[in-house]
Amino acid sequence: MATPDLRNTPSVSPEAGQAPVQLRNVVRQFGRQRVIDGLNLDIAPGEFVALLGASGSGKTTLLRTLAGLDEIDSGELRVPVARAAVFQEPRLMPWKSAWKNVVLGLRINDAKARAEAALTEVGLAHRLNAFPATLSGGEAQRVALARGLVREPKLLLLDEPFAALDALTRIRMHQLIIDLWRKHTPAVLLVTHDVDEAILLADRVIVLADGRIADGIRVDLPRQRDSGQAGFQLIRSRLLGLLGVKVHAAVDSAPQAPEQDVTLSALRRFANAR
């Protein structure tokens, strides 16, 4: 069988045994500006990867490329056919009910049953017929997540999906994402500006700078995670350094969490207890 042309569009799903995401010397430019500059990346089956970087570093362009919403100018890119993306804005059709938004674009006979199952997984079985205008921000984002899950993706792309949510809702969404990831085992790429969020959720954190991977750190911390864990502050300190943030104080191997972290840890315990 002929080798597919990989220069401008993602190829079909890789063969068994290969990483579901493979990028080799990928370039994407707008005019003379290279937003992605010779990028190489593998994401293993079922791996949860977080992507950090300053604004303009190429994070969203990379995610859009993996989602099939943008092309590459050169290089090779392989992604699964079964993939889904969730963005910061839920992007729900306001004239369609929750369940119809979940199966939007799918041609299946048991659409409502599939939508109901997906909404049940995200805790919204009771909002099956609700319209987007009646949903809270967290509920709307869960509908968007259900829309991704109903497609049974091998790759789930998350572009800052929690950025507009309040602190407690974000924590609950973090736990929901982890629970669903464990159940469905897709590879996940999360784009975020939040260093703590990246450490809390990911197996591996990658820092993007000027369209290239500056470094990657494996997060070898047990779950459930919070910022008070031994080792959390060490990983945070290193990531902040890679992002160009000066860390003034030396970080001890078992640091005392600052006041904000204590508050967030308490919120996580409260959210997990409910």
UniProtKB/Swiss-Prot annotation:
Coiled coil: none
Domain of life the protein comes from: Bacteria
Protein name: Aliphatic sulfonates import ATP-binding protein SsuB 2
Pfam families: ABC_tran (PF00005)
Major localization listed first in the record, in broad terms: membrane
InterPro entries: AAA+_ATPase, ABC_transporter-like_ATP-bd, ABC_transporter-like_CS, ABC_transporter_ATP-bind, P-loop_NTPase
Family: Belongs to the ABC transporter superfamily. Aliphatic sulfonates importer (TC 3.A.1.17.2) family.
Record-listed ATP binding positions: G53, A54, S55, G56, S57, G58, K59, T60
Domain ABC transporter, first and last residues per copy: 21-235
Keywords: ATP-binding, Cell inner membrane, Cell membrane, Membrane, Nucleotide-binding, Translocase, Transport
Gene Ontology molecular-function annotations: ATP binding; ATP hydrolysis activity
Taxonomic source organism: Pseudomonas syringae pv. syringae (strain B728a)
Catalysed reactions, semicolon-separated: ATP + H2O + aliphatic sulfonate-[sulfonate-binding protein]Side 1 = ADP + phosphate + aliphatic sulfonateSide 2 + [sulfonate-binding protein]Side 1
One Gene Ontology term, aspect cellular component: plasma membrane
Functional note: Part of the ABC transporter complex SsuABC involved in aliphatic sulfonates import. Responsible for energy coupling to the transport system.
Membrane disposition: Peripheral membrane protein
PROSITE patterns membership: ABC_TRANSPORTER_1, ABC_TRANSPORTER_2, SSUB
EC number: 7.6.2.14
Location(s), subcellular: Cell inner membrane
